[in-house]
Amino acid sequence: ILDRDRRFAAKIYEGHKKTSFPNFVAVQWNKTRPDRVLKTAKEFKNIAQVGASLQSIKNDVLHAIKRKNLTFDQIAQLRKELEKFGQKKIFSELIIGLPYETKESHIEANRQLIDLNFEVQNYNLHLLPGTEMDTEESRKKYFKKTGWRLFDNAYGIYDGKIILEGQEVVLQTNTLSVEDFKYIRFYHFLQQMMWTKKWYYDYLKFLKIYNIHPISVFNKIIEKCKKDIGEIGNLYLEFMKDYNEAESFDSFEELEKYWREESNFSRLKKGNYGKLNMLYTFKLVLNHRKAFNKFLLNISKEYATSLGLDVDNFVDLCKELLKFQ
């Protein structure tokens, strides 16, 4: 990012004020010059959300991928400065599957970003042809298993033939098991829906007042989902079935064979399959909202009991909050 970029930002915002275009600007922000980021963001006003992507907070991970991050002190200061001129939304990005990352370190990174009130976007590592992670040396050194999944909306019929585009994703590393990846997959869904997309943001902020961290809530939900034999347990099983069947093909050829079957391809055409996080957000919000709210109230009751709170009062407060989520 250069000093001149703030002048570009000012001109873009000037156009927005005059014509209402552009309404929003997507920006890939510099990772090492928070001073210039701040100056440019000020000129954009509120039409460009600021990001401070980390990928990981683990030093050996950052060393392996040859990356240098802003420090958490720098990020916290950046947030304070942005809030001074009304820029309240700030996001960060993390990647699961990087060399030396663990389930615990990845979740801890999410915890720290949530504590700074960031919106967090989590991604699975996929191996892009021509990148260092895709070399034979890196594959042997870091990755034990990979699989293939469909790129979101990357399909079509051309000259009567179904054409698909896939991506190779990491499913197991030296420090992350297959089961870790499965756990994290559903965890990412919960965090994106409840925290980042704000469907249960106020509920989570309320629990945080009682030192019940959103991370604890997500983990508790997963624990309960695995045991639940009702509506929410079935939704969890449906999610994991889609993950196991459609996001972990052994080869691109297997992916093509699966999605070219008429029954499977019709799911794509009808919009019944897509990015799992958003697909299941819609399913839960539209079809299972009451059941999920009841599920959360049972969890809230457990928290109140363990903390020695007035259970009925605490649950009533949660119930009122959930009416507006």
Q: Where does each model-flagged region fall?
A:
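A generic secondary-structure signal for well-formed alpha-helical elements
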Residues: 16, 86, 117-120, 124, ...
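Short alpha-helical segments and helix-capping/turn motifs at coil-helix boundaries
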Residues: 35-37, 106-108, 171
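Conserved SAM/AdoMet-binding glycine-rich loop
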Residues: 1-91, 96-98
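Radical SAM enzyme core and accessory elements
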Residues: 168-325
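Short, electropositive alpha-helical surface patch
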Residues: 6-17, 102-117, 182-188
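Hydrophobic, Leu/Ile/Phe/Ala-enriched alpha-helical segments that form helix-helix packing faces
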Residues: 12-16, 41, 79-82, 113, ...
